[in-house]
């Protein structure tokens, strides 16, 4: 498949959703970003929340299962404010008052809602950061659905839960539709083993390599 666009979500992603002043600090040269961090930050703050992306509905299902709420964007001058809408209380909450896990997921949810399209490549560094094992499995379930709908995903992880969940979603292919449904999954979550590759890097002197 020919990739259209590639997007990188860094491990230190939550700071960009919690602190809108970080861009102005960068403009004033008070802090230094890597090129990847700068591209990531600008993509979030320049989002058009009125234009729903291809994976918008998937992202809404993901955040509902994850937290029962909704990540929303509010325009404030040049940049976006990220807010959390609590469905039960019908109130908007600042990211600074949210759990670390929700802040970590906010960027991934926003990318799925407004940026990513079929044949794009999404690169996520340590998606499991600050996530309870249950929520790690939920994340992988929706990444698998996005993969089945045409998104390419590359992640780096230290989590056995993430790896095991990918393996579980591959093994779902051996079950009937009814058996899959009883496990609270559906056929959109089933991965073909031919579409998944795992690389284990081993350290050797001054560099790391992937054994053949």
Locate predicted features.
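Phosphate-coordinating catalytic segments in nucleotide- and nucleic-acid-processing enzymes
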Residues: 1-121, 187-212
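Short, surface-exposed, charged/polar-biased interaction segments
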Residues: 30, 116-119, 129, 164, ...
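Walker B catalytic acidic pair
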Residues: 125-127
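C-terminal lobe/lid and adjacent interdomain/linker elements of RecA-like ASCE P-loop ATPase modules
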Residues: 138-212
